[in-house]
Amino acid sequence: MAQQTQVTEEQARALAEESRESGWDKPSFAKELFLGRFPLGLIHPFPKPSDAEEARTEAFLVKLREFLDTVDGSVIERAAQIPDEYVKGLAELGCFGLKIPSEYGGLNMSQVAYNRVLMMVTTVHSSLGALLSAHQSIGVPEPLKLAGTAEQKRRFLPRCAAGAISAFLLTEPDVGSDPARMASTATPIDDGQAYELEGVKLWTTNGVVADLLVVMARVPRSEGHRGGISAFVVEADSPGITVERRNKFMGLRGIENGVTRLHRVRVPKDNLIGREGDGLKIALTTLNAGRLSLPAIATGVAKQALKIAREWSVERVQWGKPVGQHEAVASKISFIAATNYALDAVVELSSQMADEGRNDIRIEAALAKLWSSEMACLVGDELLQIRGGRGYETAESLAARGERAVPVEQMVRDLRINRIFEGSSEIMRLLIAREAVDAHLTAAGDLANPKADLRQKAAAAAGASGFYAKWLPKLVFGEGQLPTTYREFGALATHLRFVERSSRKLARNTFYGMARWQASLEKKQGFLGRIVDIGAELFAISAACVRAEAQRTADPVEGEQAYELAEAFCQQATLRVEALFDALWSNTDSIDVRLANDVLEGRYTWLEQGILDQSEGTGPWIASWEPGPSTEANLARRFLTVSPSSEAKL
């Protein structure tokens, strides 16, 4: 590949470390959980919006529901495109400015309100949620709110609020989760007054219809330029920008996701967000809050799955009674309902913590994204199984033969991307693990440095002993061993005691892993993934219990029902946690790695005999690209034309 950038593992790691937020200026519930502490006071009482904010949100949702009643999701699915009038309606409601401050023409709504909007629009069609989320969570508004200048906010935020759609351009044909390989460049020109962008960006959600782009590109280091991956706001109709492809996917049939070529695109220096070299840090910081949109979207679909499962399992009769009364199906319904309660709790808690700003939520947001994506996919799969052949059949086909057009197979297809979007589950586990072991890495020093010599490791060991001499004894005994602890939670107190005990057990096991593998721990991705999954389940149990207690306090009748749901969820989650603890040290990780290496070396190719692979000869695994002008037609189009006065017009 002509533009492939070669980097070593060490260079890639260094860039990742340089780009992450290293300080912890605010408390973090999840960080403490991984360290063996259970600071319940950080999440209890369950935070909630003010009465005024709640009333404002409800009023907006009423208007949104009225509009969505006129939107037909099947039209989007069949056409694989969102009709212009649907986008116009969302813009007129202010949906593109939900999180933009009112001084820039936005609605200045909370993260909680924003997520409730995403839940609702997603249940009409997931592409609507993707459109709004990509625009506001990772598009131009969020990076500018975090790192933009006053002038940048004045120039661009009113347009975004009015419906000028934005997109985020980071991924490249050969660059996914490893941005150190980024090949797109931003070369200073005009005596430093501008930059010239060159490159190709892949999977540009909203990129086909965007007015504004956030583009990540590498600035060469030179005199007067610190260089590095940098972020720019770019007008999508700038000369040299070509949308060469509109991609098609398994799900999200209406998503406007493409391939964008940039050739000699001139960008004024005033459009640089932050400093040169800050682009990746800005992107990661943006994602800390931006990731909360995906749990909301996943939860919206899971709620829809619960409704379908309930109604169908009463209606469908087999062997003399409704299928929902058969234990095999009842267990699935229980899982769907209990998991829905926890999904709701995790989304609400994380979002309200983001709104309050009292806590560092980088781990909570990442856990919410990881756990919600995984669990919602399981919910969708169980629903499909409950529906049987009708679950596998399309809504259009069901309707054609006179049955209710239930889009279960579409829901499953649409949910699947959440385990890949904005950090795959595998990458999320590694990112969270890095934060979870941060205190250990700080204490260990050169013990965790693969390049350190024996003298350096010996010195580091002496320093680490002080930290662990104070920390380890605190993991022996805790409040979770006292039978009366958390008794204000009634029947749920036992689950909070389980979380407290498990938190200390998790911390001890993390330490054992550090002691056993030291600098090699980062390569033990199976172990680290299980550590993170345990933390995610403990976070979800905590959120469910605290939310149930808040509901009981506010409304005893609803609270009793919430307790029932939370009880079922906690018991299910406890079984998963115990299995994960067992798997930390009893697993097939080593044999899996050995077998995978043998597979990659071609040892078992005889297993592949007797098949036809019709993809052979259709193209390379990864498309190459060369810098230069595009030879393709520009597929860019606009939903809306937003004037300088920020009025949205077709």
UniProtKB/Swiss-Prot annotation:
The active site is at 422 (proton acceptor). Keywords: FAD, Flavoprotein, Oxidoreductase. Its cofactor is FAD. GO terms for molecular function: acyl-CoA dehydrogenase activity; flavin adenine dinucleotide binding. SUPFAM superfamilies: Acyl-CoA dehydrogenase C-terminal domain-like, Acyl-CoA dehydrogenase NM domain-like. GO terms for cellular component: cytoplasm; cytosol; peptidoglycan-based cell wall; plasma membrane. GO terms for biological process: fatty acid beta-oxidation using acyl-CoA dehydrogenase. The keyword Iron does not apply. It catalyses: a 2,3-saturated acyl-CoA + A = a 2,3-dehydroacyl-CoA + AH2. Its EC number is 1.3.-.-. The keyword Flavoprotein applies. This is Probable acyl-CoA dehydrogenase FadE10. It comes from Mycobacterium tuberculosis (strain ATCC 25618 / H37Rv). The lineage of its organism: Bacteria, Bacillati, Actinomycetota, Actinomycetes, Mycobacteriales.
